[in-house]
C-alpha cells in the first residue's frame, strides 16, 4: 500500500512539473526574437492577473491545460502582458505593456492577440492576425478559434 501511495505521489508530481514547463515571456523584445528564430507568431495575452476574474478563469479553463500547452509549444511564442493592481512590476515592463495595449487597442480583459513579427531594414513590425478572449467550452473550443485565426495567415 505504501508503495502505491508513493508511486501515485511521484506521478502527480511529474504531471505538475510537466504542466509548468510552458514559458510565458514578459519581455516582448525577447519573445519577438524567439518568434522570428522559430518562425512562429506571437500570442499576446493581455491580462489583469490579480484582479480580473475572466482572465483567471481563462487561465484555469484553457491556458493552464495540457491541451493548450501542447498546442502552444507547436504553434506560438507566448507573451504575457500583465496589468496587475497589487503585484509590483518593473517600470520598463509597465511601459512596454501600456504601449502594446495602445498599439493593439485593447479595451478589456482578457484579450489575446495573435501577431506575426516581420523584420525589414532592421525594424521589427507586429502584423495583427486576429484576436480572441474568453470562450466558453474549454480548451477544445478555444483552440478551434485560435486555429482559425492562424489558418488565415497562410
Residue locations for each model-derived region?
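Sec-dependent N-terminal signal peptides
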Residues: 4-13
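Sec/Tat signal peptide C-region and signal peptidase I cleavage site
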Residues: 15-21
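Thiol-based oxidoreductase modules, predominantly thioredoxin-like and allied folds used
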Residues: 22-26, 68-95
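A short beta-strand-turn-helix
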Residues: 24-42, 72
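Short active-site neighborhood of thiol/selenol oxidoreductases, capturing the structured segment around
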Residues: 38-52
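Solvent-exposed loop/turn segments at secondary-structure junctions
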Residues: 49-52, 83-88, 107, 119-121
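Typically the conserved alpha-helix immediately C-terminal to a functionally engaged Cys/Sec
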Residues: 55-73
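Non-catalytic, surface beta->alpha helical segment in thiol-disulfide oxidoreductase systems
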Residues: 61-63, 99-154
Amino acid at each position: 500500500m505504501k508503495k502505491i501511495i508513493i508511486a501515485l505521489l511521484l506521478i502527480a508530481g511529474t504531471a505538475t512539473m510537466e504542466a509548468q514547463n510552458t514559458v510565458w515571456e514578459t519581455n516582448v523584445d525577447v519573445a519577438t526574437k524567439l518568434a522570428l528564430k522559430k518562425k512562429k507568431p506571437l500570442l499576446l495575452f493581455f491580462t489583469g492577473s490579480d484582479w480580473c476574474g475572466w482572465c483567471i478563469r481563462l487561465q484555469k479553463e484553457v491556458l493552464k491545460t495540457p491541451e493548450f500547452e501542447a498546442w502552444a509549444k507547436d504553434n506560438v511564442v507566448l507573451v504575457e502582458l500583465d496589468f496587475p493592481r497589487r503585484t509590483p512590476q518593473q517600470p520598463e515592463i509597465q511601459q512596454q505593456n501600456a504601449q502594446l495595449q495602445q498599439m493593439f487597442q485593447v479595451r478589456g480583459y482578457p484579450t489575446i492577440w495573435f501577431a506575426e513579427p516581420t523584420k525589414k531594414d532592421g525594424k521589427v513590425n507586429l502584423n495583427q492576425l486576429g484576436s480572441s478572449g474568453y470562450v466558453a467550452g474549454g480548451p477544445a473550443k478555444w483552440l478551434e478559434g485560435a486555429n482559425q485565426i492562424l489558418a488565415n495567415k497562410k
